[in-house]
Every structure is written in C-alpha cells, then in structure tokens.
A protein has these predicted regions:
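Short S/T/G/P-rich N-terminal loop/turn motif that feeds into the first structured element of a domain
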Residues: 1-49, 56-70, 77-99
Length: 99
C-alpha cells in the first residue's frame, strides 16, 4: 500500500469552509482506482489543513493525484496561502499472528 500526505495553509477562521468541502473531497477520493481511505486533518488555530490518503499502490496514488490536485487547487484557490506541500510514503504494516 501507499499513502499521500498533502498539507495546505488557508489561515485561521476557515474551519467551517474546509468542513463544508469534506464530503466533496470524500466523493472525489472514493471515485479513484485503488482508493482505500482518506482522513482530512486540520488545526483551526494555525489554519493548516490536509489530507492523508491510503491507496492500493503508488501507481494508483499518483494517478489519483492527477485528478485530485487540480480539483483541490480550484476549490481552495481563494483561500490558499501558498502552494500545498505533498509527500508520498510506502505504508508499512506489521505482520500479524492471528493464532
């Protein structure tokens, strides 16, 4: 599995605006191949928010980013205080012994 972390700053006092976009974010993510889960994260005081998403593969995450990144940019264009920061990580899962 693979994960993507995108952090963006919109400034304080925008929590309700971001909260209003969460359902749209969710629908967009769920429509992408290889989607597993997304968390929308944020700190109201600093005005920093982001998404942490999990994908079946790095290729799925990168393909989804081609769709999601422009949508995010457009949805937040009047709010963004600088470009979003993006990272990708391999997901490391512990081996489980179910016995």
């Amino acid at each position: 599995m693979y994960s993507r972390l995108v952090i963006f700053k919109v400034g304080s006092g925008k929590h309700s605006t971001i909260e209003g976009l969460v359902d749209e974010f969710d629908d967009l993510y769920r429509a992408q191949k290889g989607f597993r889960h997304v968390f929308i994260i944020g700190d109201e005081a600093s005005g920093e928010y982001g998404s942490f998403s999990v994908w079946e593969s790095k290729e799925d995450a990168e393909a989804a980013n081609v769709v999601i990144a422009p949508w995010l940019q457009q949805a937040l264009t009047s709010l963004l205080q600088g470009p979003p920061e993006r990272w990708g990580f391999e997901v490391l899962e512990p081996e489980r012994n179910d016995t």
